[in-house]
Every structure is written in C-alpha cells, then in structure tokens.
C-alpha cells in the first residue's frame, strides 16, 4: 500500500491521507463505482453529472474524492462547512467553475463537502443553487454527506448515489501497522487490533487513537490501550431494524436511546415504517392496529410535554412507542425491509416555499389591517382572495399591501402568470410610483426655505458702556450693531431662534459710572441712546423734565384729581413730617426741586449692574 508523508508536525490522519483510490481502506465496491463514474467523463458528459458519497463520518468519503482527482489528474475546487454557502456564493464559485473548461482543456472536480448541512441563514438558497448547477454543469461534481436524507429529493434524483459503509476492523489492522512502521513505533498485533475495534468503523478515529497512544513511546502494547471504546451513535435504519425485529423491550429501548433523535422525531419514523414492517399478505391488520394504539398513547404524552414543558414525560412516551412497536406483533416478520424517511418531512420540505410565501402575505395583511399574522393567516387570507377577483379593487389592494407577482399568484390560486394578473401587477406598480412622487413633492414644499445668510438675523439691543480713560487702545469685542466714532457699543443678543454668546462683563474697575445715577424706577430713557458720562440726566422723555412727568401721572383715585393747592399742601406736609423726625428728607426734596444733587438710594441696583 502506497502512503505519502507530509510534515511530521501535522496529525497522522492528514499525514497519511491516501493519494490514490488504491490507498483507500475498505469500501472496495464504492471505490469501484466511483472510478467507473469518473471514467465516463473521459468520453463525454454522463447521464448523472454529479455523484453523492454518503455514509458515516471518518470512513474515507472526502479522501476518496481527492484520491480520484489525483488518479484522473483533475483540478479540485472544494467548498466545505467552514465556507459561507449561500446561493450567491455557490453560483459565483462552483457555478463559474462548472460552466468553464480549464486552461489546458482538462477537467475540474468540484467537491461540496457536508452538503447535507446546508441550513440556516448563512446557507440560504444553497440547495436550490446546487440543483441548478448540477443540471447544466460541464465539469464533474461530488457531493459528500453523512445523511442522504439531508439532501432534497430534487438533488438526489439527478445524482448518482454511492454508499460508503463503516470500515471493518480486519481491514484497519494492516493500515495501522503500516503507520506504526513509518513512525518508528513498535506496535503489537493485540494493541493494533484493540485500537481498530474501539474505533467502531471510523478509520480516521483509529489513526487519531493510535497517535495519542504512541505519543512519546517507542513500543506500544495492549496494556497501553484504553478499552473504554467510543460513544458511537446508532444509525436510524439499524435502530428501526432492531426495534421491529426484537421481542425484548429492553433491547429495543437501548437501540432507541443510542439514537441522535428526539422522541418527537422518533415517533414519525415508527409511524412511517410500522405499516411497512407488519404488512401481511392475508390482509390481517391486527398487529398494525395494536402498534398504532400504543403509538397514539405515546403521542398524548408528547403533547403534554409541549403543553406543560415537563420533559420527564419523554421517558414514558419513548417506552410506549418503542416497546409498543416491538411487542405488538403476534408472529415474526422475516426478510429485508427498506425503511423510509417520514413522508411528513418530505411534504414539509416540498411545501416550505409556499408556506413561507403564505406567512409573508399574512404578515402584510396583518400590518395593513392591524391584526396579528396568525389571525390574518387563519381568517383573512380567504377574504382577500375574494377581493382580488374584482379587477378595479385588485389594483389598489395590491398597491396598498405591496404584493409581489408571486404573492398575487398565490392569493388568486393561479399556477402561472396570466395576462390579467400581469396587468393588475403593472398598474399597481404605476400607482405606487405616482404616490411616491406625490409624497416627495409634498415633503419638498413642507421643508423650510434655506436662510440667505449662515447667521440668522437676531434682535440686538445696543447698550453703551463708557470706556475707561486712558484705556482707549484696549481691545473690544466686535459688535454687529452700528459703531459710534466716539464710543464703541456692546450689544446684548436677544434673539430667540438661535441663542448667541453673551458679551463678556466689564470689570468694575474698567467702568466709570455717573456720579449721580438715577434710581431704577425713574430710568425712562431708551436703551438705544447713549448714556452721559457726567452731569445731570438728559431729557429722554419728549423734552419734559421729571417733575412735569410726575404731574401728568394719573392720580390714585379716578374720580377726583388733585388740585394745585392740595398738591402744594401735600408737599408741605411731607417736609414738615420729615423735619420733625430729624430726617434729611427736606434737603433731598429741595435738591429734587432745583434739579441739583440727588440722593443715591441705598441697596438700589442700576442698569449697569447686569
């Protein structure tokens, strides 16, 4: 047997991978069928352009595909589970490779490993793309799968199926001895045989166990090998055979517990194959009736598991379905039976696209009618199907729901696109385009017009602040208001739309206040006129003095005005009362009459204290 070596740092399973089909251990019949299919490509395109290699893991399926490429001198393009295998990726890589010849005119082998694991969002549409590529490929394609039923019936029907079985222990022993010799490890016959038996038909696992046992050793004996064995999952078809052929409930349950199947899945397998196994030529259905009686009771427990979320009831359901199927027969049923995959799963796979479309339509109807998708699917789909029969309302209904042409076909119950449906769909698209243009136009006119200047116009109120003498050269912040040649102004921003930064306060040492500022209640001057630096307050109220303005104020009583005599008497009374109390009110009043000095009120803030 020819083996090739690579770097010693890698695993032995990779280091001693077979280079040709003659190096493959076991499965001689499968290898011969694979070679025969490859030779048909030498004379043209065969009837089956793709082949499916299926069987348990670790028995040489992928190695056989690469060994075939080595024998035929084909280039290899491989996609495995670590790659994203959506429809777009498969069509881009495998599709382009399958439709073009190589530069030198040879063949190119396309290998899709773990093809039965095309599930989920990451591989959406991958199986459909594979089916389309196989039908039109100009290059050989090999699909590798552990479970043949993980592939769709469409793919299986257009491919050649080649089954790889578990490798027998006696076939592994010579190959394992060859590996020991190449690595310089002395292995006894008993040790190698023990490793082969513990592998459970998985040759790759046997090589890995040999490498682990021989690590750091020059000799390997049977005592160095663990006898625990591997936890090998039971094959579903072998388990079905043990369940239906057995008359021992315990043995049947052990086969069921070794399966990688839940009781919800196992009940469908038994339901599908029980009438096939217990079918009698004389037409007696008593065994089938008894078996389905136990199966119905098991289904009741499975329903309680879902309803109560009590998974301990799985034990009772498994016992009823397995033991009931095994013990319901009244006589043995010899002969080979080809067990079938549950037909319910096949029907669900075939109708998956239609169920997805139904749910999508129900979701659109629920959004439009403010109902849940479940309610719309069960109660409103038929009603909307009736509405679509009227062509006038069908156009608006299609536009409002946003239905696609395939969804329109589903609601109308049509298997193909008719002229009527195409017309409804086209008019609905035109209606949507018109509504879209109208909405954009309304949004355009609702939008505010852009400002002429980047800075919005704001209300400015100039306030004159006297400069400190001898500090005329000090820098002042610029103001958008008008500037006086004698004094610079600071403006107070009173804009309401976009608040502006307020001017910095002047320190008290930089401000020169008037000697006699007017109290706040008498400040009637306009803020837009400059303040005097010295001297009396100018006349800001239409050329009238404050005493004259006081006389024009309305009296407290609207019925009677104070006469000049009463006014003079009131002033004299104020003077007399102030003099009796020793208050300087008389001096203050006198100062107000002659327009001279005015007393500054205590604790009274002026305009400059902002």
From Swiss-Prot:
SMART domains: AAA
Region annotated Disordered, chain positions: 467-610
CDD domains registered for this protein in UniProt: AAA, HLD_clamp_RFC
MF annotations from Gene Ontology: ATP binding; ATP hydrolysis activity; DNA clamp loader activity
KW Nucleotide-binding (keyword) present: yes
Coiled coil: none
Basic and acidic residues biased stretches: 467-478, 502-515, 594-603
Keyword terms of this UniProt record: ATP-binding, DNA replication, Nucleotide-binding
Keyword Glycoprotein applies: no
Binding locations of ATP: 55-62
GO biological process, one term: DNA replication
HAMAP family reported for this sequence: RfcL (MF_01508)
UniProt subunit comment: Heteromultimer composed of small subunits (RfcS) and large subunits (RfcL).
Family indicated by similarity: Belongs to the activator 1 small subunits family. RfcL subfamily.
Entry function: Part of the RFC clamp loader complex which loads the PCNA sliding clamp onto DNA.
The protein's name in its UniProt record: Replication factor C large subunit
Source species: Methanosarcina mazei (strain ATCC BAA-159 / DSM 3647 / Goe1 / Go1 / JCM 11833 / OCM 88) (Methanosarcina frisia)
């Amino acid at each position: 047997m020819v083996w090739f070596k690579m770097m010693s740092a890698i695993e032995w399973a990779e280091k001693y991978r077979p280079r040709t089909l003659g190096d493959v251990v076991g499965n001689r019949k499968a290898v011969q069928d694979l070679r025969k299919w490859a030779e048909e490509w030498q004379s043209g395109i065969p009837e089956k352009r793709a082949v499916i290699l299926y069987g348990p893991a670790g028995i040489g399926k992928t190695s056989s595909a690469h060994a075939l490429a080595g024998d035929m001198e084909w280039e290899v393009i491989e996609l495995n589970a670590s790659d994203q295998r959506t429809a777009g990726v498969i069509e881009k890589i495998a599709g382009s490779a399958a439709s073009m010849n190589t530069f030198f005119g040879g063949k190119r082998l396309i290998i899709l490993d773990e093809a039965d694991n095309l599930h989920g969002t990451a591989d959406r549409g991958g199986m459909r793309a594979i089916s389309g590529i196989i039908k039109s490929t100009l290059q050989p394609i090999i699909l590798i799968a552990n479970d043949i039923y993980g592939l769709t019936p469409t793919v299986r029907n257009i491919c050649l199926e080649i089954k790889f079985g578990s490798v027998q222990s006696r076939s592994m022993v010579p190959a394992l001895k060859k590996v020991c010799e190449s690595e310089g490890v002395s292995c006894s016959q008993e040790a190698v045989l023990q490793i082969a038996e513990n592998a459970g038909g998985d040759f790759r696992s046997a090589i890995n166990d040999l490498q682990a046992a021989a690590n750091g050793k020059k000799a390997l004996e049977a005592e160095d090998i663990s006898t625990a064995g591997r936890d090998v999952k039971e094959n579903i078809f072998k388990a079905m055979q043990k369940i239906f052929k057995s008359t021992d409930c315990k043995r049947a349950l052990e086969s069921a517990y070794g399966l990688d199947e839940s009781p919800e899945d196992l009940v469908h397998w038994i339901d599908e194959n029980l009438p096939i196994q217990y079918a009698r030529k004389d037409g007696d259905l008593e065994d089938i009736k008894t078996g389905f009686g136990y199966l119905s009771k098991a289904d009741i427990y499975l329903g309680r598991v879902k309803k109560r979320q009590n998974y301990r009831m799985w034990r009772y359901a498994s016992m009823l379905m397995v033991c009931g199927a095994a013990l319901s027969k009244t006589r043995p049923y010899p002969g080979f039976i080809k067990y079938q995959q549950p037909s319910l799963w096949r029907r669900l796979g075939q109708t998956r696209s239609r169920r997805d479309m139904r749910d999508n339509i129900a979701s659109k109807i629920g959004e439009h009618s403010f109902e849940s998708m479940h309610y719309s699917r069960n109660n409103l789909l038929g009603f909307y199907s009736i509405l679509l029969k009227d062509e006038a309302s069908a156009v608006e209904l299609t536009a409002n729901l946003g239905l696609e042409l395939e969804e329109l076909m589903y609601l109308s119950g049509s298997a193909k696109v008719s002229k009527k449906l195409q017309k409804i769909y086209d008019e609905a698209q035109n209606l949507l385009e018109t509504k879209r243009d109208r909405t954009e136009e309304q949004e355009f006119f609702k939008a505010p017009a852009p400002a002429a200047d980047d800075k919005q116009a704001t209300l400015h109120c100039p306030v004159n602040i006297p400069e400190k003498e001898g500090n005329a050269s000090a820098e002042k912040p610029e103001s958008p208001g008008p500037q006086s040649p004698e004094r610079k102004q600071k403006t107070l921003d009173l804009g309401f739309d976009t608040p502006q930064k307020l001017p910095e306060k002047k320190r008290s040492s930089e401000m020169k206040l008037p000697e006699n500022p007017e109290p706040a209640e008498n400040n009637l001057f306009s803020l837009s006129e400059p303040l005097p630096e010295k001297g009396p307050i100018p006349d800001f109220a239409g050329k009238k003095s404050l005493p004259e303005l006081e006389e024009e104020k309305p009296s407290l009583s609207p019925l009677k005005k104070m006469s000049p005599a009463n006014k003079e008497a009131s002033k004299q009374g104020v003077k007399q009362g102030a003099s009796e109390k020793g208050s300087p009110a008389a001096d203050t009043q006198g100062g107000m009459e002659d327009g001279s000095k005015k007393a500054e009120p205590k604790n009274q803030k002026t305009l400059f204290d902002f």
